[in-house]
Design a protein with these regions (language model features):
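Conserved small-residue
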Residues: 1-108
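Core subunits and conserved enzymes of cellular information-processing
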Residues: 96, 100, 117, 187-188, ...
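Repeated loop/turn-to-beta-strand initiation elements of outer-membrane beta-barrel proteins
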Residues: 128-133, 218-219
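Membrane-embedded beta-strand positions of outer-membrane beta-barrel proteins
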Residues: 133, 230-232
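Extracytoplasmic gating/loop element in the C-terminal half of outer-membrane beta-barrel translocons
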Residues: 16, 22-23, 34, 139-230
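Hydrophobic, lipid-facing positions within transmembrane beta-strands of outer-membrane proteins
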Residues: 116-122, 129, 206-211
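Strand-connecting loop/turn motifs
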Residues: 126-129, 225-227
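Extracytoplasmic loops and strand-loop junctions of Gram-negative outer membrane beta-barrel proteins
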Residues: 100-108, 113, 189-197
Length: 234
């Protein structure tokens, strides 16, 4: 690192002295606000639960199932506008919890490096026929699904969100949604480096296949050979 200074590469990769190779850096999502009133927190930034009756807010909040009567704080943009129903509830790292969501709230949200990699192989034999299978595996680590993120940003008129998003996006107050409201505005729910789009990168892959056949001994004796093996390898 130049002069030991941390830096970000490609708006997602984070490099810092003492850090890990492959760190993802961005905003950590804690879900979607179901109501405008869901953006309510204690002074310690514990999220409160708004009380509704017949769809009408009762101007009451619960904390751990009990009525809360203390001070109420909200998360806002740097310009002071509070986040609303359908927006991401962005977490803030220790030391920057002021309720204002800005670039200071980026943090390490995951890592691309696997914990374990390796291979497995086996050979099965039946009479003159044999089958070799070679597997490769990688366990742990994450990938950032930038393709899916870009598809669901609502920034490009020629791009249709995935069916998963269309059926699980926030549309009405109270929706327990997986994806935010379908708008591209200054709340920037489509901001790059969103922990929501981190996915488990673990996999096991059948990498090599070899099918072999040993010609019968009585066939090859006529050719004065010891063995003939015919195989196909993929």
């Amino acid at each position: 690192l130049s002069e030991g200074k941390a830096y970000m590469e490609g708006d997602i990769w984070w490099m810092q002295e003492g850090g890990r190779v492959g760190d993802f850096y961005g905003f950590k999502s804690a879900g979607i606000f179901a109501y405008d009133e869901s953006n309510a927190f204690t002074d310690k930034w514990e999220q409160l639960t708004p009380v509704f009756e017949n769809g009408v807010f009762q101007y009451k909040y619960l904390l751990d199932g009990k009525e809360y009567t203390g001070n109420i704080r909200q998360k806002t943009l740097p310009n002071g506008k509070p986040f609303r129903g359908g927006d991401y509830n962005w977490e803030e790292p220790e030391g920057t919890r002021d309720g204002v969501i800005d670039d200071n709230d980026r943090m390490v949200i995951g890592n691309a490096m696997p914990d374990v990699t390796g291979g497995l192989n086996t050979t099965v034999t039946w009479k003159n026929l044999s089958l070799y299978l070679g597997f490769y595996y990688s366990l742990g680590g994450q990938i950032y699904n930038a393709a899916e993120h870009n598809r669901n940003m609502f920034k490009y008129t020629g791009t249709t969100p995935s069916p998963e998003v269309i059926h699980n996006m926030w549309l009405h107050p109270g929706d327990q949604a997986i994806y935010p409201r379908p708008y591209n505005d200054d709340y920037n729910n489509a901001r790059m480096g969103n922990s929501f789009y981190l996915e488990d990168a673990s996999f096991i892959r059948l990498q090599n296949i070899r099918v072999a056949y040993d010609l019968p001994e009585n066939w090859i004796k006529k050719l004065m050979l010891k063995n003939i093996n015919i195989y196909a390898f993929v």
